[in-house]
Design a protein with these regions (language model features):
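A glycine-/small-polar-enriched, mobile loop at the entrance of the PLP active site in fold-type I
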Residues: 3-54
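General beta-strand structural signal in soluble alpha/beta enzymes
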Residues: 6-8, 69-73, 95, 117-119, ...
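Active-site phosphate-binding strand-loop segment of PLP-dependent enzymes
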Residues: 10, 109, 121-176
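A general structural motif
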Residues: 2, 66, 90-92, 140-141, ...
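PLP-dependent aminotransferase-like
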Residues: 77-144
Length: 182
C-alpha cells in the first residue's frame, strides 16, 4: 500500500513512527496491560496522562501557574454556547465574523444575550479579514470574539484587534501551537 498524504484542513498526515507507536500502545499503553480506551478515567495511569499533557502544554504555550488548563469535550461547537454562558455577564458581546465558525459562534451567542456583529467579511464570502483598526466596541460588551484562522476560506488575522480593554476571545482551534500567544 502506498501512503496517501492529507494536507487538508482538519486531520492531516502524521509521521509513520507516531502511527507505529500509537498502534503498539493500542493494546498495551505504557506497560499497563490495557489500552487507554479501556482505562478508568479515575486510575493513576490515566491521571498521569492528564498531568503529563497539562505539563507539556504549559511548557509549550508558556502558560503561567495562575491560569487553569481545561480538557473539555464537545469541540468548537460546544464552546460557541459555553463562551456566552460563562462570559456574557452584561448579556452583550461583540463579534467579528470572518468565516463559518465565527458566524456559528455569533448565531449561538444570540441565544444568550445581545450579540453585536461589529465587523464582517460575509459580503465577499469571507474572502478577507475586515479592517479592525477602529472597531465600534460596545461600551457594555463583556468580550470581543474572533476566529483567528479560517481554514475554509484561507484567511487569518495578521494581528489581533485592539479590543479597547475588553476580553478577547479567540477560537484558535485550527492554529493553536503554531505561534506564540500572549
Amino acid at each position: 500500500m502506498s501512503r496517501v498524504y492529507n494536507f487538508s484542513a482538519g486531520p492531516a498526515v502524521l509521521p509513520e513512527e507516531v502511527l507505529k507507536e500509537v498502534a503498539d500502545e493500542m493494546l498495551d499503553y505504557n506497560g499497563t496491560g490495557m489500552s487507554v480506551m479501556e482505562m478508568s478515567h479515575r486510575s493513576a495511569a490515566f491521571q498521569e496522562i492528564i498531568d503529563t499533557a497539562e505539563k507539556d502544554l504549559r511548557e509549550l504555550m508558556n502558560i503561567p501557574d495562575n491560569y487553569k488548563v481545561l480538557f473539555l469535550q464537545g469541540g468548537a461547537s460546544q464552546q460557541f454556547a459555553m463562551i456566552p454562558m460563562n462570559l456574557m455577564k452584561n448579556k452583550v458581546a461583540d463579534y467579528i465574523v470572518t468565516g463559518q465558525w465565527a458566524k456559528k459562534a455569533y448565531q449561538e451567542a444570540q441565544k444568550y444575550g445581545k450579540a453585536n456583529k461589529i465587523a464582517s467579511s460575509e459580503d465577499k464570502t469571507f474572502s478577507y479579514i475586515p479592517d479592525c483598526s477602529d472597531l465600534p466596541i460596545s461600551p457594555d460588551a463583556d468580550y470581543v470574539y474572533i476566529c483567528e484562522n479560517n481554514t475554509i476560506y484561507g484567511t487569518k488575522f495578521k494581528e489581533l484587534p485592539n479590543t479597547k480593554g475588553k476580553i478577547l476571545v479567540a477560537d484558535m482551534s485550527s492554529d493553536i501551537l503554531s505561534q506564540p500567544v500572549n
